[in-house]
């Protein structure tokens, strides 16, 4: 069977919009009746998802699978790096954790990893009409080019057409695009089919002279200028998209009742599972904000301690900022606190590391629970949209459990290892109703019909609508169906 076309969405920088544009293209092609699959050879993210067979992939690829109408699969993200302390990361290959690696270890094995990624992409191309690939970081990191896995290394191995996305909202986009084009090799440059300007605000006619000059300098046409899309906040891939002070979602607009709920999510330095926080923001009348100060912990109706890749280190950070005392006072006053993953572990009485250098630290002592951190990674898909990914095991539990025999509950304190639990609509409504009661907000009402899944699809449709309006997707399909080495000839421009 002939392989279907595939192409690569690369970006001049991290957070240029690659993940969102890839998701939007997947959605647009799926709506057009094409069998489309997402692909990211290598992802570096702590915001992961667990597949139905217990594998682990980047959360962005799970979202892109939803855009395609597919279940998440390890095929869509065969290599995942989960950054940890001391410049090391947990390496996940085809959904299974392989252990910790340092930068030198990873670079030495990148040739093998590139082969794994290329073979997986080829398998997808044989089964789908089109595969939309997402690059990683910047393709212009020439110091890493020899062993590149996710950008031009993959594009050369699979002969992919490449589109470079630049974020105009942060400034300097023309220099970013020109510099990326200039610094890479002639062989890689030949694969570039076009530039894409993302997050544009203002009058496009003011930008046009710059685009004309950019094409004169590079020989590459700007295929699309994508406007800034307000209120797109789905499945952040990394903490760059969750800065302190940022309000998540629509900001509690249109409450059904007479009162709102304010949620403060502590912005841990090494946090993961940001989608857990985002799930609450779909509810009318709920405002969710990332915070790192004592005042916000005092003043909010609910405080969330999210997941983290380094429970002990982030607990020390939390103490350094005085947040431990604020959380303890909240608990004494009966004000709601929710800990998820590593955040739940912090709420324990003690946390013991059973690794090579055993040690023990005091937790926040909000629960009569003792946690042991072990080398073994626990991954469980509960089949209801919730899942567990953690190294902590409960050695002692003296509390009422919270969710089907898991987690802990004491009055207004909630803790669980389950990520994604609040994406379940009835579960989220029950939880917020309890929070409102404990917070003294009887005038807050949950919506009977808000759907987290539906909101995400609506957001994906919004992105797809914008892409269809500002990028000729029929032309894009025609371009990527041609041989990659035909790029940037007069006939293809």
From Swiss-Prot:
HAMAP family for this protein: CobQ (MF_00028)
GO terms for biological process, alphabetical: cobalamin biosynthetic process
Keywords, ordered alphabetically: Cobalamin biosynthesis, Glutamine amidotransferase
Protein name according to UniProt: Cobyric acid synthase
Pathway(s) it belongs to: Cofactor biosynthesis; adenosylcobalamin biosynthesis
Similarity field: Belongs to the CobB/CobQ family. CobQ subfamily.
Stored PROSITE patterns: GATASE_COBBQ
Lineage of source species: Bacteria, Bacillati, Actinomycetota, Actinomycetes, Mycobacteriales
Pfam family, one: CbiA
Top-level taxon in the UniProt lineage: Bacteria
Function field: Catalyzes amidations at positions B, D, E, and G on adenosylcobyrinic A,C-diamide. NH(2) groups are provided by glutamine, and one molecule of ATP is hydrogenolyzed for each amidation.
Active-site residues from the entry: 419
NCBIfam families: cobQ, PRK00784.1
Domain spans labelled GATase cobBQ-type: 260-427
């Amino acid at each position: 069977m002939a392989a279907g076309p595939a192409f690569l969405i690369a970006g001049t920088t991290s957070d240029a919009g690659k993940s969102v544009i890839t998701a939007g293209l997947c959605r647009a092609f799926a709506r057009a009746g094409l069998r489309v699959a997402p692909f990211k050879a290598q992802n570096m993210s702590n915001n992961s998802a667990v597949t139905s067979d217990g594998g682990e992939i980047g959360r962005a690829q799970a979202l892109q699978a939803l855009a395609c109408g597919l279940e998440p699969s390890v095929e869509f993200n065969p290599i995942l790096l989960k950054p940890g302390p001391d410049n090391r990361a947990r390496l996940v290959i085809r959904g299974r954790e392989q252990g910790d690696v340092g930068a030198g270890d990873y670079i030495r094995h990148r040739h093998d990893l590139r082969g794994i990624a290329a073979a997986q992409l080829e398998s997808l191309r044989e089964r789908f009409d089109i595969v939309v690939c997402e690059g990683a970081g910047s393709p212009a990191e020439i110091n890493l080019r020899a062993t590149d896995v996710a950008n031009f290394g993959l594009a050369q191995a699979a002969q992919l057409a490449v589109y470079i996305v630049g974020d105009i909202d942060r400034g300097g986009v023309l220099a970013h695009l020109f510099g990326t084009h200039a610094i890479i090799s002639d062989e890689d440059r030949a694969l570039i089919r076009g530039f894409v300007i993302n997050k544009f605000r203002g009058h496009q006619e003011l930008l046009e002279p710059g685009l004309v000059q950019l094409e004169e300098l590079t020989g590459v046409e700007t295929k699309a200028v994508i406007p800034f899309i307000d209120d797109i906040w789905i499945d952040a891939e990394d903490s760059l998209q969750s800065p302190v002070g940022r309000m998540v979602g629509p900001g509690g607009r249109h409450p059904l009742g007479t009162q709102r709920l304010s949620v403060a999510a502590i912005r841990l330095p090494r946090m993961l599972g940001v989608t857990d926080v985002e799930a609450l923001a779909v509810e009318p009348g709920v405002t969710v904000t990332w915070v790192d100060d004592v005042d916000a912990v005092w003043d909010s109706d609910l405080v969330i301690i999210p997941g983290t890749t380094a429970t002990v280190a982030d607990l020390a950070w939390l103490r350094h900022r005085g947040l431990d005392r604020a959380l303890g006072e909240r608990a004494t006053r009966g004000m709601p606190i929710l800990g998820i993953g590593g955040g739940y572990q912090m709420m324990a009485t003690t946390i013991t590391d059973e690794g090579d250098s055993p040690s023990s630290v005091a937790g926040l002592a909000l629960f009569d629970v003792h946690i042991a951190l072990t080398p073994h990674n626990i991954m469980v898909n509960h089949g209801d949209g919730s899942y567990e990914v953690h190294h902590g095991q409960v050695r002692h539990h003296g509390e009422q459990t919270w969710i089907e025999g898991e987690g802990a509950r004491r009055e207004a304190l909630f803790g669980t290892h389950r990520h994604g639990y609040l994406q379940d609509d009835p579960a989220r409504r029950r939880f917020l109703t309890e929070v409102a009661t404990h917070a003294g907000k009887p005038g807050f009402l949950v919506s009977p019909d808000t759907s987290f899944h539906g909101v995400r699809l609506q957001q994906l449709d919004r992105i797809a609508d914008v892409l269809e309006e500002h990028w000729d997707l029929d032309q894009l399909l025609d371009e990527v169906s041609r041989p990659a080495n035909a790029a940037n000839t007069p006939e293809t421009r």
